[in-house]
Regions:
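TPR/TPR-like alpha-solenoid signature
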Residues: 9-13, 63, 67-70, 110, ...
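Hydrophobic/aromatic packing residues within the alpha-helices of TPR/SEL1-like helical repeat arrays
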Residues: 35-38, 83, 90, 97, ...
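Flexible helix-coil transition and linker loops at the boundaries of alpha-helical arrays
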Residues: 41-62, 79, 95-112, 141-155, ...
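Structural motif corresponding to the intra-repeat A-B loop/turn of tetratricopeptide repeats
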Residues: 79-80, 126, 168-169, 215, ...
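TPR/TPR-like (Sel1-like) alpha-helical repeat modules
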Residues: 456-474
């Protein structure tokens, strides 16, 4: 039995050395086999029912296994950019920590709440907000309970993780937790004013600007972005130029440009885009991986402005430039989902503005082809971002079919989108953009039901669409536009069918 335990450690060490020499992760099935092997080993290490190993030996093996598991997690985090496998190994580390304590060990090499914090970080990176939220809250609660004097930096970090998890579920709560995160750093700054704390505070402020923009508080988003730029300029003077500051400045200009666009101030939007791009070029020269995401927002905003000015082919050209930008991105899964997003945007421009439904359908199919390599893999089927990309593909394809009067194909694609949304609702039932898509898709299907004289189905879908969109009306903008569309349809079809579909006075 001792020999068997030793062999497992030898094999794991060999596998780790292999990983260390590679630039891409090996076949997922191989990784899964090692994960199962580690789980089996951890489960077998129980001093109470193990006649071959002393309690000391069990604890020692668990300790060494935890150390090795942590190494695996770090290599997937930092070198292979694979959050899914990093999460798998952090979950094993948590199991080992609990097993260690269960076997009477009190000197585990790090706090359990730190492992929960890492797990929250990876769920957040995988866009699984509900699990990111629960793990971050657990980490914060355990830290406050077990630490005599909790570290303000950890309090700040965990509050920011909770804020990120709330961002697309409860925006007001998200802003509140970002402010709590900053409060902890401001208190710490009174003791020791330092670069890391100031960067943490400005990052929270930038995220608050993003949320304001997402919930259509456009004027507030502009004010918040300008405030962030003032602070960043002061930090620039204080600390000098570095990649992180240049990244935050270009990122803030990308938010400001989109906020100006939403306020229909296209001149200031274009000025912000140019300033953002000038900073972003420095990131691109240094191969800073985040520059792709910032250029994405800047180019996308410029594309929207071009569409407003009816320069549609120029807008499409810019989207194709974005394809080149993302082709250099390191992380394959994110690269493919972003490329898929761009094809969806190209499809929308062809469909909505140019009435080129054939080109729109072809672009949507290219989007499916790009994401197919991942969404056919069961490991990625539950990833929220992948699901949302596939959902948008189907909705956009359905819209193109609808405009081309290919109604049966439109119904099929809208229905496929609804099927994906059922999976998404199981994961994130309150996500704002998901509720919007759900209400819109039901509305479109209701219109098609009425076209084919399916009154009962159409009325049912329209009532569900209305109930959903009522929860979004308070955010204004596109949400209020959809609310009015659905409400007007209800009024029209109630008159046509001479009866109430839903009580109209329930609007929030």
């Amino acid at each position: 039995m001792n020999e068997q335990h030793g062999l497992i450690f030898d094999r794991l060490n060999e596998f780790f050395e292999e990983l260390n020499q590679q630039d891409v992760a090996p076949n997922q099935e191989v990784i899964e086999l090692y994960i199962k092997e580690i789980y089996a080993e951890v489960t077998s290490l129980n001093a109470d029912n193990n006649p071959y190993l002393s309690r000391h030996s069990v604890l020692e093996r668990l300790y060494n296994l935890a150390d090795l598991t942590c190494d695996f997690a770090e290599i997937f985090e930092e070198k292979l950019f694979n959050h899914l496998n990093a999460l798998n190994f952090r979950n094993i580390e948590l199991k080992i920590a609990k097993q260690y304590k269960m076997n009477g060990g009190n000197d585990f090499w790090r706090n359990i709440w730190e492992i929960y914090a890492d797990i929250a970080l990876h769920y957040s990176a995988l866009n699984i907000d509900s699990k990111a939220l629960s793990n971050a809250k657990t980490a914060l609660k355990l830290m406050i309970r077990t630490e005599a004097k909790p570290d303000p930096k950890w309090i700040s970090f965990l509050n920011s993780r909770i804020a990120y998890a709330y961002q697309d579920i409860a925006p007001d709560k998200s802003i509140n937790y970002f402010n709590k995160s900053s409060d902890a750093l401001i208190e710490y700054n009174k003791v020791k004013d330092c670069y890391e704390n100031n960067m943490g505070i400005i990052l929270n402020d930038i995220n608050i600007a993003i949320i304001m923009l997402e919930i259509n508080q456009v004027d507030d988003a502009i004010k918040q972005s300008l405030k962030c730029l003032d602070t960043l300029n002061n930090l620039f003077e204080k600390y000098g130029e570095n990649e992180e500051l240049v990244n935050y400045i270009s990122h803030t200009y990308s938010i400001l440009s989109r906020a100006y666009f939403e306020s229909k101030d296209y001149d200031n939007a274009e000025k912000a885009i140019e300033k953002g791009l000038s900073f972003c070029k420095r990131l691109q020269e240094n191969k800073f991986n985040n520059y792709c995401e910032i250029i994405d927002v800047l180019y996308s905003t410029k594309s929207l402005i071009l569409c407003e000015k009816q320069r549609y082919m120029k807008a499409i050209e810019l989207q194709y430039k974005l394809l080149d930008v993302w082709s250099d991105y390191k992380e394959g899964f994110k690269r493919s989902t972003k490329i898929c997003d761009i094809y969806v945007e190209i499809s929308m421009i062809f469909s909505k503005y140019l009435d080129e439904q054939g080109m729109s359908i072809e672009s949507a199919r290219l989007a499916f082809r790009e994401i197919k390599q991942y969404t056919d893999n069961e490991l990625f089927m539950s990833d929220k971002y992948a699901l949302s990309v596939r959902r948008r593909c189907y909705i956009n394809l359905a819209d193109a079919y609808f405009r081309a009067r290919m109604y049966q194909s439109a119904i099929s694609s809208y229905t496929n989108a609804l099927d994906i949304m059922k999976e998404e609702f199981d994961m994130e039932s309150e996500k704002i953009s998901l509720v919007y898509s759900y209400s819109y898709t039901l509305y479109q299907l209701a219109m098609l039901d009425f076209k084919y004289n399916r009154k009962a189905e159409g009325c049912k879908r329209l009532s569900y669409s209305y109930r959903s969109v009522c929860t979004l009306k308070k955010y204004g903008g596109v949400y209020e536009v959809l609310f009015n569309m659905v409400r007007n349809a209800l009024s029209t079809y109630e008159k046509k069918f001479d009866g109430k579909i839903i009580e109209l006075d329930t609007a929030q």
